[in-house]
Regions:
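Charge-lined substrate channels and their catalytic hotspots, especially those that engage the 3′ end
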Residues: 1-294, 301-347, 378, 385, ...
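Electropositive polyanion-binding surfaces
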Residues: 41, 181, 191, 197, ...
Length: 745
């Protein structure tokens, strides 16, 4: 032992033991796992005092990342082989660690994740094997916990209480002390706070902080999903009061310096159940045959100022969440459904995008203004469609009688839509045919019936107008070099493209464009296969080859829509990026472009970090770095909203299908992997797995390149029609399992 190590030991402990360097050299020489007793024997430490000092030293070395403790004992860590990343845990127990934008995620087996929760920041040791053919990944430690609360069902076994997590990604045994039950009854859903995280020496310890209800309670599915992801559907009383201070009508002072568009017959066209109206449209044709389109969007930015309390909360939420039985709004209802909603026959503040569109459907000029509008009518999609497509129908006549003045303007909108539709086709926007289902709930918030959503020209008309405004917005942001958020959609990744081309080759088909196909190439193939019996299969795989759209501070274009630049402008009531865009436009209009720091707001995104006063309406307080942080946050929140919505729909569907266990259904194969194939029932759209081991016959195998599951006699492909029997419903996992009853093969 060297003198430095000896001196360190003497200073640290009353009972000197070998220093860290000596212990590290011991591991280097033995090159294996050692438990504490083996280390003590190797160092000739025999007294209880020496062994206690060794225990402390080993724990300190573990804490400082020099040693790792596993069930086999301690092991030496090579710092150069350590990486840190976020763990994503699969419901089956294994997980993947994302640690690099360029490197593949690291696989960790189930037996290493007994003390880890989904989303934890972990440290992993990458160790090549003796043959250096592949690396083994060993979890070293959890650096930062992501989970602080767990939702589950309170259970009892003998005299002990425990929590059965609602999230199947949580596999740990979770103990609940009898003194920490918070009046919860066995069988009830609860939210529990983690008081002690698991390790090799103890299980997870929690205390119940809220009783959510019984499994039979109306709306329990939404309540569980929101709590599972830490989302509050409630509003702070102070924020509600702040939102209500703006009143219910636009103040006269706020109308000053606005462009007055109230005489123009703007109209809102939305779904029958819509409660917030954030867009209104008007168009007219010029004598030259061109068009003038005005898209007016609710001016949320006038009422929600950068860095004020409402803004901080809206920023946290980043989006409204739409569930089958409720909406979790980004803004308080006094704003979202009240003062900011473009209700008919009421003065409303709006950001207006005015566009000139030529006879070819190209936007030749656009400008933005702070406007004052009044919607002249609130129409549903079906009402608007009846006016232009079926004016002599009962609905068409009823709309015409109730508001005859609006009819010619709606017909103008439809005429412009047809021009824009031709341009859309020429531009090459990808047209996938997708099936959307609407869940109608009863008073108990269970599914009463399921019906397909029927889109008509009115849906597509409003969509095209919003696209025009969003593109004009993106061009405005790019031209003026304003740090803001673009909505980007990259082309297909090479890995997905290679797999797609292999599949198409098996079908005797090719996708043009080489390594960088365009949306035109996708559309050409879709048209080519439209009359084939396997058209649905091919469309499904073309769709799955696409990347996911996201927010970015850099314009990268939108592949699917075939736009060079695209941003979100049209929904500031329900999307924070749109609110940010409105602030950018206002800042340019008012010539206040100086970037300011957001201080700790973006770092913490919590109300209790609010330390400074709200900024003026003129301010645009976002630097490039701020926008970078916001782009990631808004993308994550958008994906989270989709996840929560899917989970609630899956839970409701499982509950709806449970009484039909043992019955047969006609279905189509929607996807497949090595576990089996997924089916979607034709009548309800309910989805579930047919496991490969349950297929009638023997020796079935999955061919990833051909997207087939087959044996010598039978072959299953995506799009095939099969008759399936509902075998079981897993309410906790929100999954259904089927078996093949009668195959059409």
């Amino acid at each position: 032992m060297n003198q430095t190590a000896q001196l360190s030991s003497t200073q640290t402990y009353d009972n000197p033991i070998p220093g860290r360097e000596f212990i590290l050299s011991l591991f280097s020489s033995l090159k294996k796992h050692l438990n504490r007793e083996q280390i003590a024997d190797a160092l000739s430490l025999n007294s209880p005092e020496e062994k206690e000092a060794l225990r402390r030293r080993l724990r300190a070395m573990e804490r400082d990342g020099q040693l790792s403790f596993q069930r086999r004992g301690y092991q030496l860590i090579d710092p150069e082989s350590l990486v840190s990343g976020t763990i994503s845990i699969h419901p089956d127990g294994f997980g993947f660690v994302t640690y690099s934008d360029t490197e593949k995620d690291l696989f960790l087996p189930k037996n290493q994740l007994k003390h880890v929760f989904d989303g934890d920041l972990v440290q992993v040791l990458i160790e090549p094997d003796k043959n250096a053919k592949r690396a083994y990944n060993n979890l070293i430690k959890v650096l930062e916990r992501n989970t602080t609360q767990i939702v589950g069902v309170l259970q009892r076994e003998g005299k002990s209480y425990f929590l059965l997590p609602d999230d199947t990604k949580v596999s740990q045994h979770i103990e609940v002390d009898e003194s920490k039950l918070c009046d919860a009854r066995v069988g009830q859903y609860v939210t529990a706070k983690i008081t002690s995280y698991p390790n090799f020496r103890q299980d997870t310890q929690v205390e119940i902080i809220e009783v959510l209800g019984d499994p039979s309670d109306a709306g329990i599915e939404s309540k569980l999903a929101l709590h599972r992801h830490g989302i509050s559907g409630l509003w702070n009383k102070i924020l509600l009061e702040k939102a209500s201070t703006h009143g219910t009508q636009v103040a006269e002072a706020d109308k000053a310096s606005r462009v007055d568009y109230r005489k123009l017959p703007f109209v809102t066209i939305d779904g029958a159940d819509a409660r917030d109206f954030d867009d209104a449209v008007y168009c007219e044709q010029t004598e030259a045959g061109d068009w003038r389109l005005l898209v007016a969007i609710a001016d949320v930015s006038h009422y929600v100022l950068p860095n004020d309390a409402l803004d901080i909360e809206a920023q946290q939420r980043a989006t409204s969440i739409y569930l089958p039985d409720q909406v979790v709004p980004m803004l308080p209802e006094s704003l979202s459904n009240g003062l900011c909603s473009l209700n008919p026959n009421e003065d409303r503040l709006a950001m207006v995008c005015k566009m000139s569109i030529n006879a070819k459907g190209l936007v030749t000029q656009s400008e933005f203004s702070e406007g004052l509008i009044q919607s002249h009518a609130r129409l549903t999609y079906n009402q608007a469609n009846a006016l232009v497509s079926k004016p002599s129908s009962k609905l068409g006549k009823a709309v015409l009688e109730s508001n005859p003045a609006i009819a010619p303007h709606v017909k103008n909108l439809h005429s412009l839509f047809k021009v824009l539709l031709k341009q859309r086709n020429q531009r090459g926007a990808i047209e996938f045919e997708t099936r959307e289902l609407a869940l109608k709930l009863n008073k108990h918030k269970n599914i009463a019936n399921i019906s397909p959503v029927k889109r008509n020209d009115a849906h597509r008309m409003i969509e095209e107008f919003m696209l025009c405004a969003n593109v004009a917005t993106a061009q405005f942001l790019e031209t003026n070099k304003i740090p803001s958020l673009f909505r980007v959609h990259a082309g297909p990744q090479q890995k997905k493209l290679t797999a797609l081309r292999a599949f198409l080759s098996e079908k005797g088909l090719t996708l043009g464009g080489g390594d960088k196909p365009s949306s035109h190439h996708y559309n050409d193939l879709l048209k080519k296969v439209s009359h084939r019996t396997d058209a649905k299969v091919i469309q499904t795989l073309l769709l799955r080859s696409q990347s996911q759209a996201e927010y970015s501070p850099k314009n990268q274009g939108h592949f699917g829509l075939a736009y060079d630049a695209y941003a979100h402008f049209t929904s500031p009531i329900r999307r924070y990026p749109d609110l940010l865009t409105h602030r950018a436009i206002r800042a340019k209009i008012r010539s206040t472009k100086k970037p300011m720091s957001l201080q700790g707001v973006l770092r913490h995104l919590k109300l209790n970090t609010l330390a400074s006063k709200a900024m003026s309406k003129n301010a645009y307080p976002y630097s490039v770095d701020d926008v970078e942080v916001l782009s990631k946050h808004c993308s994550e929140q958008s994906r989270l909203a989709d996840t929560v919505s899917r989970e609630v729909e899956s839970a409701l569907m499982c509950k709806y299908m449970q009484p039909f266990i043992g019955e047969t259904f006609q279905a189509a194969i929607a996807g497949m992997n090595s576990s089996g194939f997924f089916v979607a029932l034709e009548n309800t759209g309910a989805e579930g797995l047919v496991h490969i081991t349950s297929l009638p016959g023997e020796d079935f195998s999955f061919d990833a390149s051909k997207q087939k599951i087959a044996n010598k006699k039978v072959c299953y492909e995506i799009g095939d029609s099969v008759t399936v029997l509902l075998k079981s419903v897993d309410l906790r996992g929100r999954k259904m399992h089927f078996t093949v009853a009668v195959s059409t093969h």
